[in-house]
Design a protein with these regions (language model features):
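Acidic surface patches and DE-rich sequence motifs
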Residues: 22, 70, 170
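Short amphipathic alpha-helical signal-transduction/dimerization elements
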Residues: 108, 112, 201-208, 212
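Charged catalytic carboxylate motif
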Residues: 5, 32, 48, 137, ...
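A short, flexible beta-alpha/helix-coil linker loop
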Residues: 33-36, 125-126, 184-188
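Extended hydrophobic
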Residues: 130-204, 223
Length: 231
């Protein structure tokens, strides 16, 4: 196949969501390919992460979800629910607004602010009264996440739930997903969040090792460039 034919094919696949073009001009699998693959077999990432997520849920007693980013939405690709009577319910395949959930904020924080701004709609839909009302509020939250190393979101997607999340990197040390633990907001006490975060970090390290991460101690959050970084 000629180079021009390959380029035309990749362009078509990119437009239809089956592949996604990276900043370095390489391509990675797109969300539509994942959706097609889910009909026949679970996504490789979800299969690998599943056992570790089960261990995590057994330790923290709240549910865990692995999500990927599709534009400005997150898509849940693996889920282990808590056995507690009062728990956060979700479904594999569910989509959420990325700026409203901890998984989404974790992944957005690994991007340059300029790229995030290109994705955000104007105005921002607000599922709850606690959701971000402006792009500036989103950027402030992303800066906070980069500083502390994790994402904590309270009542921004559902008015009675909280979530804490970390990005998950792949073999090229790029962020490929995010893992969160969600809980009813009344259970999100400082002590419980600290304990959950410690277990979450351990689980992400295990999953990243399986994914082939070669720089486990490197930060997933980039140094910000351009005009916004200087403001």
């Amino acid at each position: 196949m000629s180079k021009s034919s390959v380029h035309t094919l990749l362009t078509t696949l990119d437009q239809r969501g089956y592949v996604r073009r990276l900043d370095d001009q390489r391509y990675t699998i797109g969300i539509r390919a994942w959706q097609v693959g889910c009909v026949a077999t679970p996504l490789w990432m979800s299969r690998v992460a599943g056992p570790y997520m089960t261990e995590l849920v057994n330790k923290v007693a709240d549910g865990a979800a692995l999500a990927v980013l599709d534009g400005v939405e997150t898509v849940c690709i693996q889920l282990v629910e808590s056995t507690q009577v009062v728990r956060v319910h979700d479904n594999i395949g569910n989509r959420c607004l990325a700026w409203c959930v901890s998984n989404g904020i974790s992944m957005l924080a690994t991007m340059q602010d300029e790229e995030v701004l290109r994705l955000l709609p104007d105005p921002l839909p607000r599922p709850t009264e606690f959701s971000f009302a402006s792009e500036a509020e989103v950027l402030d939250k992303l800066a906070e996440v980069r500083a502390v190393g994790h994402s904590l979101m309270r009542r921004t997607w559902r008015p009675d739930t909280s979530g804490i999340s970390l990005p998950v990197r792949g073999a090229d040390n790029r962020t490929v997903a995010a893992l969160c633990v969600s809980m009813p907001d009344y259970r999100a006490t400082p002590d419980r969040l600290d304990e959950t975060l410690a277990e979450l970090r351990h689980t992400v390290r295990q999953i990243e090792r399986e994914f082939g991460v070669t720089e486990p101690d490197a930060s997933p959050f980039p140094i910000q460039k351009g005009v916004l970084a200087a403001q």
